[in-house]
A protein has these predicted regions:
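Nucleotide/phosphate-binding catalytic cleft detector across ATP-hydrolyzing
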Residues: 1-16, 20-205, 223-225, 234, ...
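Glycine-rich phosphate-binding loop of actin/hexokinase-like ATP-binding domains
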Residues: 202-243
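Small-residue helix-packing motif on alpha-helices
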Residues: 251-254
C-alpha cells in the first residue's frame, strides 16, 4: 500500500531524469533515503518530452528503483516543469470601483483570477508572479486595506507551450505515477533553494546552465522580474569542441 510518509520528487532534464525520496526531519530538513536516475536523451529535447512511451518507461523504472531502496511504496511525487518554451509575459488587469473603497482580499483574488484567464494561443499559464498594484496613482505591493477607486494589478505570467505540460502529464499518467499538487516551475523552485532572501531583495540574476538549455532568472525586491530559457547548453559546447577532432567523451570532460 502506498504511503505518504515519504517525500518524493522527480526532475526531468534534457540529459537525465532524476528521482529522490526522503523524510522530513524535525528541523525541517529532508533526510535523503533513495536516489535513482535514467538517461533522458532518447525522449527529451530542449527540456520537452517528445516520446511519451519512452518517458513513461523511464518514470516507471525510477519509481521502482526508489521503492526498492525504501522498501515501501510511493504515493505521490512532486514534479518540476521547465523547457525551451518557458518564458515570462507581462499583463495588467484594471478595475474601476463605483466609489472610493478599501481594497479587499476578495477583489484582489478576482483580479488575479482574471489575469490567469488571459487568452493565449497554444500557451498555458503555469504560474504568476504579481509585481505590484497601482491604486489611483500610487504603487503598492500589498494592496489589501488601501483606499482607492482605481486599481490595476500588474503581473508577470510564467507561460509555456501547452504541449509541454500536456506531454509531461500524459507521461506520468501512462506510468501510473500521481503528481502531488500542481506542477512546480523548476527554475523558480531552484531559485528558492539556492538564493538567499537578501540576494533576491537587493537584486540578482540566476543562470542555470543545462545540457540543452540555459535558464536566466532576475529577482528584485523579493519578486521575480524576468525569466527566459535560451536554446543553448553544455551539449552545444561539447559539439563545438568535437569539431577540433576530439572524441566526444574527452570533449565532455573539458
Amino acid at each position: 500500500m502506498a504511503t505518504t510518509d515519504f517525500i518524493a520528487a522527480i526532475e526531468l532534464s534534457s540529459s537525465k531524469i532524476s528521482g529522490i525520496a526522503g523524510k522530513k526531519s524535525s528541523d525541517g530538513s529532508i533526510q535523503v533515503l533513495a536516489y535513482a536516475r535514467e538517461d533522458a536523451s532518447p525522449f527529451i529535447h530542449k527540456g520537452a518530452i517528445y516520446n511519451i512511451d519512452k518517458a513513461a518507461q523511464a518514470l516507471t523504472s525510477i519509481i521502482n528503483k526508489l521503492e526498492g531502496q525504501l522498501n515501501n511504496s510511493i504515493a505521490k511525487v512532486y514534479v518540476g516543469i521547465g523547457g525551451q518554451s518557458l518564458r515570462t509575459v507581462r499583463n495588467a488587469v484594471s478595475r474601476t470601483l463605483e466609489e472610493e473603497s478599501i481594497i479587499s482580499q476578495e477583489l484582489v483574488d478576482e483580479i488575479c483570477d482574471e489575469n490567469r484567464d488571459v487568452p493565449l494561443v497554444d500557451m498555458s499559464v503555469l504560474d504568476v508572479a504579481p509585481q505590484e498594484y497601482k491604486i489611483d496613482n500610487t504603487l503598492h505591493v500589498e494592496p489589501v486595506g488601501v483606499a482607492g477607486r482605481y486599481i490595476t494589478g500588474q503581473f508577470l505570467n510564467i507561460v509555456a507551450r501547452a504541449s509541454l505540460k500536456k506531454n509531461l502529464e500524459h507521461s506520468f499518467e501512462q506510468a501510473k505515477v500521481e503528481i502531488a499538487d500542481d506542477l512546480l516551475v523548476a527554475p523558480t523552485a531552484l531559485a528558492k533553494a539556492v538564493l538567499t532572501e537578501n540576494e533576491m531583495r537587493s537584486g540578482c540574476a540566476l543562470v542555470d546552465f543545462g545540457a540543452d538549455t540555459t535558464t536566466v532568472l532576475v529577482y528584485k525586491n523579493n519578486i521575480l522580474r524576468y525569466l527566459s530559457v535560451l536554446p543553448l547548453g553544455g551539449n552545444n559546447i561539447t559539439h563545438d569542441i568535437t569539431s577540433l577532432q576530439m572524441e566526444e567523451e574527452e570533449a565532455e570532460k573539458l
